[in-house]
Swiss-Prot record:
This is E3 ubiquitin-protein ligase TRIM4. Residues 212-253 form a coiled coil. Residues 288-500 form the B30.2/SPRY domain. E3 ubiquitin-protein ligase. Mediates 'Lys-63'-linked polyubiquitination of the innate immune receptor RIGI, this linkage doesn't lead to proteasomal degradation but seems to enhance IFN induction. Zn(2+) binds at C87, H90, C109, H115. It is found in: Cytoplasm. Its main location: cytoplasm. Belongs to the TRIM/RBCC family. GO terms for cellular component: cytoplasm; cytosol; plasma membrane. SUPFAM superfamilies: B-box zinc-binding domain, Concanavalin A-like lectins/glucanases, RING/U-box. Pathway: Protein modification; protein ubiquitination. The gene is TRIM4.
Amino acid sequence: MEAEDIQEELTCPICLDYFQDPVSIECGHNFCRGCLHRNWAPGGGPFPCPECRHPSAPAALRPNWALARLTEKTQRRRLGPVPPGLCGRHWEPLRLFCEDDQRPVCLVCRESQEHQTHAMAPIDEAFESYRTGNFDIHVDEWKRRLIRLLLYHFKQEEKLLKSQRNLVAKMKKVMHLQDVEVKNATQWKDKIKSQRMRISTEFSKLHNFLVEEEDLFLQRLNKEEEETKKKLNENTLKLNQTIASLKKLILEVGEKSQAPTLELLQNPKEVLTRSEIQDVNYSLEAVKVKTVCQIPLMKEMLKRFQVAVNLAEDTAHPKLVFSQEGRYVKNTASASSWPVFSSAWNYFAGWRNPQKTAFVERFQHLPCVLGKNVFTSGKHYWEVESRDSLEVAVGVCREDVMGITDRSKMSPDVGIWAIYWSAAGYWPLIGFPGTPTQQEPALHRVGVYLDRGTGNVSFYSAVDGVHLHTFSCSSVSRLRPFFWLSPLASLVIPPVTDRK
């Protein structure tokens, strides 16, 4: 139900105001008790209902408590600050000015019994008459109040208009910002679309380039395979021909040796000469694979996962010494015969002995050291450099390998996955002795790439990105960097470069 309908239901038809002590008469209509008393006939007999004219006796009045409570609650809700320009009793616009009471009233007040006989004028006309100066200087106080009220009303109206103008200006500004934001969003979407297409196009080019490079390397490898097969077949054919010739000569010599003495003495030099000139000194070259696995952009891709590896000096063999910043390590095993001079030389050369920490297991038999890093997940890449071309080994290992006593046992079987390398080449650490693989140019810097997701550790030439070897170490949950140095060998861990 609308607020106006509720107010109408709670308004007395006689005084046109909220019910005061409402009562019901025989016909069912409700009125204020005071309004009925003021309209009763002097004799006290039955009186007609002001609404339907049905006669009712004064004794038939019944208090309407429900209507009284509803009226009280409604009036209570409407208490509080009355907005300017509204009637404090009925919350209706003040459109009239009561000349008898000298105050503005609403249309409901005009119809009430209180103002039925009063003279009314529109509030704008009343204000205009006073504004134009049609009043004496000795005006009464009620006129001053009226003027103040009307001036306040128009000031408030001016403030509302000013506020409205400000709000309109703000709305225009916000709408402009909204248009700019929509434009920015559209441009951003276009840029995202363009960038997505650019990325897709560039990676498609890169993919095509890699496919072409793959085909080129495979063609080179196939060509090398055919040439090597041809050479091997030629060598095999030549060896077979030599073997057949030797067999024939052996039979011929055997037959000559069984011939009579006179026949043997007739021409012995021919057979002897043929056996002497038979050349069996063939130089068979070792078969090598010359086509290397060099993937373009491999170095750049690996450096995305580069990590800083620090040496755990408390795990190092006593013969290993470290630089002051801890990135260089050297094996001083050859200087063990003069330890005093060796210690002094290490001091002046900037080297220091490994730090000793109580209750930490270290390598006692092999010149090894571990890295501080412990890898359990993710992808990691680091580089190791050897500047003296002596034999070294780098890779990863389990944490419980410090007790190994024999170099020949360093292999995946004991939890070490590494490669040896020196000026002679490189070979996977799967036991001694190993057959080195030549690397051109000479290998002096190796990259180690550990992928815990696939469980593989791969080795690359850090100079040109050529793949060297890959181990599987997926069965181990914790891995650490591993380093082994031959006598007088040294290793350097380069600092991490910027990853882009």
